[in-house]
A protein has these predicted regions:
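Gly/Pro/Ser/Thr-rich low-complexity, intrinsically disordered segments predominantly at protein N-termini
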Residues: 1-206
Length: 206
């Protein structure tokens, strides 16, 4: 198991969103949070495979149901002049695709997924939770490969995140109606085939 740590390369600033865009390369994973730029460490192969598996499953489901568009970890959310997080996975509903521009998403996505790495623990569980809640990201999934758990947070009618508990070992999304996963799938080696998982999920929808 990889040791947990909260250390991360960062540039304290304060920087604006425009500074962030000018300073960070397009191929570099980074976040702007409260004027501070956090540069992600290179991914290990396990995290990369986990990201790829989940990204494909969500993308195929969203496409099959014609719900919206899924974006990877280089899509920044321009929330305001000092905040531009880049979720590992961002889903935008069809009704909100006008927010999507070539270089960024203007405002919140509807669902954000963060895959926890040793240097992002504090940001994913604390800073980004607050930021996504305040911005109005309807669902926030924290996928913690280190602890082998998935935390699903959903905005309530007061705009506060509430944790959604599994039902019969499954986590169900409301932003993606009909979508669910078994967290255990993410930790299996090998993981179940993506096409088989999609067929099982879609099979319940008739």
């Amino acid at each position: 198991m990889t040791p947990r740590t909260t250390k991360s390369a960062h540039q304290a600033g304060p920087y604006t969103y425009e500074d962030f865009c000018a300073m960070v390369r397009e191929d570099q994973k980074a976040d702007l949070i409260n004027g501070v730029i956090y540069v992600a460490s290179p991914e290990n192969t396990d995290a990369n495979e986990l990201f790829g598996w989940l990204f494909v499953v969500i993308s195929l489901f969203a496409e099959a149901r014609e719900l919206g568009q899924v974006y990877g970890s280089r899509a920044a959310l321009r929330l305001d002049g000092k905040n531009g997080p880049e979720p590992d996975i961002a889903f935008v509903l069809k009704a909100h695709l006008h927010r999507v521009h070539r270089s960024h998403i203007d405002g919140p996505c509807d669902l954000a997924v963060e895959i926890v790495s040793p240097d992002s623990v504090g940001r994913d569980y604390e800073s980004k939770r607050r930021l996504y809640q305040e911005a109005g990201v309807a669902e926030y999934w924290i996928v913690d490969e280190i602890e082998e758990k998935v935390t699903l947070l959903r905005l309530d009618d007061k705009g506060k995140y509430r944790e959604v508990r599994p039902r019969k070992g499954e986590l169900h999304s409301t932003v993606l109606p009909g979508f669910w996963i078994r967290p255990e799938w993410l930790w299996q080696n090998p993981r179940p085939k993506k096409t088989q998982v999609l067929a099982e999920i879609l099979g319940r929808l008739g």
